[in-house]
């Protein structure tokens, strides 16, 4: 697990918007999305509900805490 991915997840959880979080992290939205997907695969859980609006799942909230 990369420390960078953990930090990116914290920022994304704060903004709940990939574009805004990516901009604040000085990276691209596709790159951020890839890192979060890799983190989810590594943990074996879904951290975010990607529907009309981005939301943390119960596992995502627990992981953030």
Feature locations, PLM:
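Short, solvent-exposed amphipathic helices
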Residues: 59-65
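Short helix-boundary/capping micro-motifs
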Residues: 10-26, 53
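Residue cluster at the C-terminal edge of the helix-turn-helix DNA-binding motif
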Residues: 15, 24, 37-46
């Amino acid at each position: 697990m990369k420390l960078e991915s953990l930090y990116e997840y914290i920022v994304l959880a704060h903004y709940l918007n990939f574009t805004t979080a990516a901009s604040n992290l000085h990276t691209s939205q596709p790159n951020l999305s890839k890192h979060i997907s890799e983190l989810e695969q590594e943990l074996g859980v879904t951290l975010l509900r990607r529907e009309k609006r981005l939301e943390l799942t119960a596992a995502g909230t627990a992981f953030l805490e």
